[in-house]
Amino acid sequence: MPTTNEADERMRKFKNKGKDTAELRRRRVEVSVELRKAKKDEQILKRRNVCLPEELILSPEKNAMQSVQVPPLSLEEIVQGMNSGDPENELRCTQAARKMLSRERNPPLNDIIEAGLIPKLVEFLSRHDNSTLQFEAAWALTNIASGTSDQTKSVVDGGAIPAFISLISSPHLHISEQAVWALGNIAGDGPLYRDALINCNVIPPLLALVNPQTPLGYLRNITWMLSNLCRNKNPYPPMSAVLQILPVLTQLMHHDDKDILSDTCWAMSYLTDGSNDRIDVVVKTGIVDRLIQLMYSPELSIVTPSLRTVGNIVTGTDKQTQAAIDAGVLSVLPQLLRHQKPSIQKEAAWAISNIAAGPAPQIQQMITCGLLSPLVDLLNKGDFKAQKEAVWAVTNYTSGGTVEQVVQLVQCGVLEPLLNLLTIKDSKTILVILDAISNIFLAAEKLGEQEKLCLLVEELGGLEKIEALQTHDNHMVYHAALALIEKYFSGEEADDIALEPEMGKDAYTFQVPNMQKESFNF
């Protein structure tokens, strides 16, 4: 049995007539929280360096030395060698530790930490007289920081943040890149370390590296690092940091590399996942047009975050939503509703649900751009998660649309798939569907076509489904279904009400004029 608070929350979601568009959008943001959470499988938070070729990191002399097979060192030997004070021994043992940590399967991160090697590895980061040792230590620490939060914490507690930030400006590009990689892992752990990096002034040296001379692979790492600095929202990144990073992200949005575009779009999605003020700073960069272009990309890794970003933007004000409409979002959404990936269908429907929460002129633009038919198709045969978002789109549309707009949706066949979904187990979605049906009946009442709609609902098997909900476990569902039946389907009483004369201005009228009735026939 739901608690009073749950019931109140459901009632708020059910009763949305009379709410303004901002309230409708805000409610949708809360309901689709699972859409808004950063999904760990969509963009990688942390990465281990397991595959750099040795010839990139060793001097020719060291390569010659490594060509002779030597048995791997034990952890005890590594600890002794790293603490020996002998440069050659330090390097050999640090490299052995790095190799252990770079194993693809079960790297012994905790063993290295418990052996007390992190302070020594951090110390080696400042050995500017030995760039190979610096690099090996940086690589080892990068891989430890790619682990759990506790493992990342051990790297931070060892003093690695200032040491790595100073290495961003290293004259050796491979060391600088490894430092960025390590810092990206630290930032990816969460808002605490993200803000620690920002407070240590990591952004200026990082942005200085975004230039045409930076190799592509390195630029990818920098972009990923920047996206991690934009990530997380408890708390959000400081606005001062956002304003520093945004111009460079805007520049990177025009790159032609798919990995850079993907990470930049993810960064934009994090920055727009917040208050209207945060959405506004992104919209004001003028980047919305480019985001819409990227929604046409054949690459899923680009479509997903660009769609997410635009979806976030249309949770904002009517003006912010209009910026997305003016940039052409309504032209690309029909094809995304039919995308082969259900996750894209779901996000597209979510975006539409927020546009549908807008004023009637924005709803009219949805109609003009041909969104109703693919939306009904999705409601009919889409993946269930996508169908749930489509249900929200229909309910918001019928809440804020004009009578004529509601009729157009009904004429597109929305009733049958909507009624069919009343048999699902998700109480929240059933309430939203009943809300949409109630909204459609209100439109029919205004046209004097309530009786026709009753017959249509009955022919589609809807009455039977609504009646069945009177035995539903959820009392909110039961009450909503009962209210519909009592108001519109109570047998002879309903017929009597339908035949009662209606008081017009000058006389009694039984129904609206025929012309109007034909124009808006259900």
From Swiss-Prot:
Main location: cytoplasm
Domain called IBB: residue spans: 2-57
Ranges for region Disordered: 1-22
Mapped ARM repeat ranges: 109-151, 152-196, 197-235, 236-280, 281-320, 321-362, 363-402, 403-447
Protein encoded by which gene: kpna1
Similarity field: Belongs to the importin alpha family.
Lineage of source species: Eukaryota, Metazoa, Chordata, Craniata, Vertebrata
Domain of life: Eukaryota
Segments for region (NLS binding site (minor)): 308-396
Pfam annotation, one family: IBB
GO cellular component assignments: cytoplasm; nucleus
Keywords: Cytoplasm, Nucleus, Protein transport, Repeat, Transport
Region (NLS binding site (major)): 139-231
Motif (Nuclear localization signal): 42-51
Composition bias, Basic and acidic residues: 7-22
Domain comment in the entry: The importin beta binding domain (IBB domain), which is sufficient for binding importin beta and essential for nuclear protein import confers import only, but not re-export out of the nucleus.
The protein's name in its UniProt record: Importin subunit alpha-5
GO molecular function: nuclear import signal receptor activity; nuclear localization sequence binding
